Amino acid sequence: MKQSSNVPAFLSKLWTLVEETHTNEFITWSQNGQSFLVLDEQRFAKEILPKYFKHNNMASFVRQLNMYGFRKVVHIESGIIKQERDGPVEFQHPYFKQGQDDLLENIKRKVSSSKPEENKIRQEDLTKIISSAQKVQIKQETIESRLSELKSENESLWKEVSELRAKHAQQQQVIRKIVQFIVTLVQNNQLVSLKRKRPLLLNTNGAPKKNLYQHIVKEPTDNHHHKVPHSRTEGLKSRERISDDIIIYDVTDDNVDEENIPVIPETNEDVVVDSSNQYPDIVIVEDDNEDEYAPVIQSGEQSEPAREPLRVGSAGSSSPLMSSAVQLNGSSSLTSEDPVTMMDSILNDNINLLGKVELLDYLDSIDCSLEDFQAMLSGRQFSIDPDLLVDLFTSSVQMNPTDNIKYTKSENKGLEATKSSVVQHVSEEGRKSKSKPDKQLIQYTAFPLLAFLDGNSASAIEQGSTTASSEVVPSVDKPIEVDELLDSSLDPEPTQSKLVRLEPLTEAEASEATLFYLCELAPAPLDSDMPLLDS
């Protein structure tokens, strides 16, 4: 064998070991010369390997053969059957052939496919992967903690929603009970009806609650159909007849001077008042299908109350109504009859008048004044806004105090009796007198309940009744004071609807005597200073 520097020492020693004849009993070429055989591994490892190599380990020899590309040859017939340990072992390489030692240069030791640089790069990549995995793990833990928090918050929110739903249902039940109570309160106490019937008190002995005076003039006629004389017809507007009670017509005239009003004398019969110059252009028509009476109209100079009622108007009147006409609904008899019977009649008359709009307006007051309502429920005592009571107890046809109202002064011409039906109207001289537009002075005496709720106590009402004769319509010699009364008393702002405000009464105001006095339910006969309209 030719020595070559390109052939590794292991291959040179192996070639020499196989070529020598004295070692053929341990290692030799195969029959075809393409491979070599190791006949006895144990003896070969103990006797031959130490001579050529520095070890006697057969496994190390086989490992070096594998490093140079030698492969162990396994025959088909013996591949399945396990060979004996001491049997021959054959190794083969494409460039290791018998008699071709020049091919040994082509046998190269296997070099690892990975380079150190590549190993470093792989290590860096592995570090990056590990760090990213750690970050992902941290994020996952954070997300899990957040998820647990969200779950707990969701559970608490659902609990709160269930509690709120229960509270809402309970509140709805409370509101439903409150509404039922208010409906009962309205039906029992008549606080809502805007069409509540009130007796018309036109006497001048009661204390005037406001500086509003009403002068009624009448003119006798022969039939039941009466017309209102007037110089201008454009001021009249027709209105639908709502009930069979007293209706006040307002005749708008712009051209009359202020004059004084004479005293209307009393008679023991039904009286008709006629005048040529009368204070306002107002006609009052009353249905006489039933025997209803109005109180006697008295002048400012008379201090004694009227004893005989005044029959006014007829149901057959066809005179037109103004846009500012006011309908006054009569009430049941409030004289000395049984209070329980009287209240039952009022309830029966007014329950049918309750409308949806009025009830809804009253129910809206719950949102405005819940604390006052609670105080009323606890003490079962309440008071009402006086401005609202004025709106409640007036007629359903609202009249703006600044619309189509004129102030005139006229003189009474005489009285004439009739028992059928009478219509009041003004004379032509009264229509020619000078007037103040948008203002009309009307005198009336309301219940003490209204006066009390407007801010006057019961004692003030009684004191006002004793001085009524001095506070009625001004006399002929004081026309300037009437103007001042008009300017100071009439509110130029339009009437606005108000809600009921319930306030607790004091102990003095809530006493039994005071409440009976306010409601005109005193068991004793009423004072002669307060004659009522028996309707």
Curated annotation (Swiss-Prot):
Residues 313-325 have a biased composition (Low complexity). There is a cross-link at K2, K82, K135, K139, K151, K210, K218, K237 (Glycyl lysine isopeptide (Lys-Gly) (interchain with G-Cter in SUMO2)). It comes from the Eukaryota. Pfam families: HSF_DNA-bind, Vert_HS_TF. Residues 359-384 are annotated as: Hydrophobic repeat HR-C. InterPro entries: HSF_DNA-bd, Vert_HSTF_C, WH-like_DNA-bd_sf, WH_DNA-bd_sf. Keywords: Activator, Cytoplasm, DNA-binding, Isopeptide bond, Nucleus, Stress response, Transcription, Transcription regulation, Ubl conjugation. One of its GO terms (biological process) is spermatogenesis. It is found in: Cytoplasm; Nucleus. Residues 298-325, 418-437 are annotated as: Disordered. GO terms for cellular component: cytoplasm; nucleoplasm; nucleus. Residues 426-437 have a biased composition (Basic and acidic residues). Residues 119-192 are annotated as: Hydrophobic repeat HR-A/B. One of its GO terms (molecular function) is identical protein binding. Residues 7-112 bind DNA. Isoform alpha is expressed predominantly in testis while isoform beta is expressed predominantly in heart and brain. The keyword DNA-binding applies. DNA-binding homotrimer in stressed or heat shocked cells, otherwise found as a homodimer. Belongs to the HSF family. DNA-binding protein that specifically binds heat shock promoter elements (HSE) and activates transcription. In higher eukaryotes, HSF is unable to bind to the HSE unless the cells are heat shocked. HSF2 is expressed in a form that binds DNA constitutively but loses DNA binding by incubation at greater than 41 degrees C. This is Heat shock factor protein 2. It comes from Mus musculus. The lineage of its organism: Eukaryota, Metazoa, Chordata, Craniata, Vertebrata. The gene is Hsf2.
